[in-house]
């Protein structure tokens, strides 16, 4: 585990910051997480997930060891080129209930951006208990993440009409 010299930002504060990315965002409790969805006009039951803040392990998601005292995960997707330049090609989709093979990344390390242990195949990343400077360093990526979600949302809406 990484040594920590700066305190982690509180999970609630991270969720509130994400809501400030733009219009059409809402926060919902989803699978025990604080999830941020893109759902302009509230036309879908939830919308498309933009990011999540999770503070406990799930039945099929234990690799990050989120059940440790004070540990939570901020997770969001990256545009394909950003994911590839940082982590290489995304791993294969795991079998149902499995984790992806993320190579040598320590998925339990605090404050380090790593591939998501379950959703890296969809270009999702995680950072555990980020400090304020670490959150600030991620801010340029978050609007890009939202644009990926908006494009996916628009494609889904076109296919539905």
Positions of predicted regions on the chain:
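Charge-dense, helix-prone N-terminal extensions
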Residues: 1-161
């Amino acid at each position: 585990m990484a040594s920590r010299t700066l305190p982690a930002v509180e999970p609630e504060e991270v969720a509130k910051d994400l809501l400030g990315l733009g219009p059409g965002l809402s926060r919902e409790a989803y699978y025990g997480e604080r999830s941020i969805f893109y759902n302009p006009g509230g036309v879908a039951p939830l919308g498309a997930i933009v990011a999540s803040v999770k503070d406990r392990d799930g039945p099929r998601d234990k690799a990050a060891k989120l059940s440790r005292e004070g540990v939570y995960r901020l997770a969001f997707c990256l545009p394909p080129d950003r994911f590839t330049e940082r982590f290489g090609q995304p791993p294969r989709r795991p079998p149902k209930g499995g984790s992806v093979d993320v190579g040598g990344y320590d998925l339990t390390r605090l404050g380090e951006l790593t591939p998501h242990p379950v959703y890296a195949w969809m270009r999702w990343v995680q950072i555990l208990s980020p400090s304020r400077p670490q959150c600030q360093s991620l801010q340029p990526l978050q609007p890009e993440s939202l644009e990926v979600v908006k494009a996916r949302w628009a494609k889904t809406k076109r296919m539905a009409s």
